[in-house]
């Protein structure tokens, strides 16, 4: 490995998350490689990153006062999603029941959590369960944005209903990363999909297969939902309207799961509100529909299903913009991501020589 991996790498790093990580992001041309890069542990994969997909969790955890630094470390490189090429693999313990990846193989995937050594760097170490071969014919750059939102959308829909055909799903927020994948996945499973978005994104959501689109700029989302047949599942990708969950009994069937994916901010009030939704008895003012905050678990088989759909043309990544590694590209990328107005995903091209 010593002959193929340099002693240092280029990486975007921040040492403070106040007021934001992008206000402190700097390109380090001589950053150390991830810990263990030359001595990989069991089921670890060293990846030379071609592109990184950005997610709000990249900055939301890091920006939690005091706690963020403990979770992520400092200095830190943000980013969890990637597309790249395998450099080396650690011993395979067979805990992941798949074939070994080979050096040189193109892969996409995600890290398990925000890390000091994230994916906005030339090299990253991924868990084997979070790394899968890129299917033939897929655009490598686009696969960089699939793992987190694709897996979130897949598990929030596929795992929550036993029988999907004909089931009615409401996806709150259809034009972002999770929403664009969620619409397509729900349709693949045979569901009837209603989603919400702003006026400029209505046509996008319809083009992805949404049966009904609520324009929240023109109408009240909850009022519109109450006029429709009751839903069997709600996936909330945005966290607004803030009273959407409490209104759910008026537009969902009894027992319909409510899956919280997105939130405006992780605040003490948000955490307390979630406690009442999840734990407080309904007869004492708590939630009257099963509520959970979405937690995804990397699963090679799920990634492979997403890859098959992409290969078959049944699932596509909606990419808002691809930024470069140089000239403050990542800074501008996070600034745009933070607006919440991106159509689909934002990608940073780490290897700027790569062409699909």
Curated annotation (Swiss-Prot):
Q: What induces it?
A: Expression is significantly up-regulated at the end of late growth phase, in the presence of Butyrolactone I. Expression is positively regulated by the pgm cluster-specific transcription factor pgmR.
GO MF annotation: an example: nucleotide binding
| Pfam families assigned | ADH_N, ADH_zinc_N_2
> Belongs to which family?
Belongs to the zinc-containing alcohol dehydrogenase family.
Q: Which domain of life is it from?
A: Eukaryota
> Could you name the Gene Ontology cellular component terms for this entry?
mitochondrion
Annotated source species: Aspergillus terreus
What EC class does the entry list? Answer: oxidoreductase
Protein encoded by which gene: pgmF
User: Which keywords are on file for this protein?
Assistant: NADP, Nucleotide-binding, Oxidoreductase
Deletion phenotype, per the entry, is: Does not affect the production of the naphthoquinones derived pigments.
Task performed by this protein: FAD-linked oxidoreductase; part of the gene cluster that mediates the biosynthesis of pleosporalin A, ascomycone A, as well as a third cryptic naphthoquinone derived pigment, all responsible for the coloration of conidia. The pathway begins with the biosynthesis of the cyclized heptaketide 3-acetonyl-1,6,8-trihydroxy-2-naphthaldehyde by the NR-PKS pgmA.
Listed binding positions for NADP(+) are 57-60, 175-178, 198-201, 216, 261-262, 342-343
Presence of the UniProt keyword Heme in the record: no
Asked if the keyword Transmembrane helix belongs to this entry, the reply reads no
Q: What is its EC number?
A: 1.-.-.-
**Protein name as annotated:** Trans-enoyl reductase pgmF
What the entry lists under InterPro entries is as follows: ADH-like_N (IPR013154), GroES-like_sf (IPR011032), NAD(P)-bd_dom_sf (IPR036291), PKS_ER (IPR020843), YIM1/Zinc_Alcohol_DH_Fams (IPR050700)
